[in-house]
């Protein structure tokens, strides 16, 4: 199985790719998908993809779901696209593995 994130041990940071579906019935991580040999977490968000609402919804949902501060999550790529890369700061790799593994079925 491909690794679903890139982890930097020196900075305690991780890069995670997500595929976002806006206008969903509920905020939910739906599993994973591989696109062009790159693994993405599938994330449904209720917010509309306009004026940054979906991006804000992504940060709010992931912070709450993963028990992280909102300031530790940043969208660094794909602000106007459904395929995004997020940076998670100040996260232990063991905790990140625990989070990711909880969604693998």
UniProtKB/Swiss-Prot annotation:
SUPFAM superfamilies with a match to the protein in the record: YggU-like
One GO cellular component term noted in the UniProt record for this chain: cytoplasm
Extent of the signal sequence: none
Coiled coil ranges: none
SS bond list: none
Record-linked Gene3D superfamilies: YggU-like (3.30.1200.10)
Matches recorded under InterPro entries: DUF167, YggU-like_sf
Homology family: Belongs to the UPF0235 family.
Matching PANTHER family: UPF0235 PROTEIN C15ORF40
Stated name of the protein: UPF0235 protein RT0827
């Amino acid at each position: 199985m491909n690794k679903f994130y890139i982890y930097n041990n020196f900075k305690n940071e991780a890069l995670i790719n997500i595929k976002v579906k806006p206008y969903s019935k509920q905020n939910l991580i739906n599993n994973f998908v591989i696109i062009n040999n790159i693994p993405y977490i599938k994330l449904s968000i209720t917010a509309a993809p306009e004026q940054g609402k979906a991006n804000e919804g992504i940060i709010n949902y992931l912070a709450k779901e993963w028990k992280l501060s909102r300031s530790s999550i940043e969208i660094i790529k794909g602000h106007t696209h459904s395929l995004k890369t997020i940076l998670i700061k100040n996260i232990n790799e063991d905790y990140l593995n625990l989070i990711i593994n909880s969604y693998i079925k």
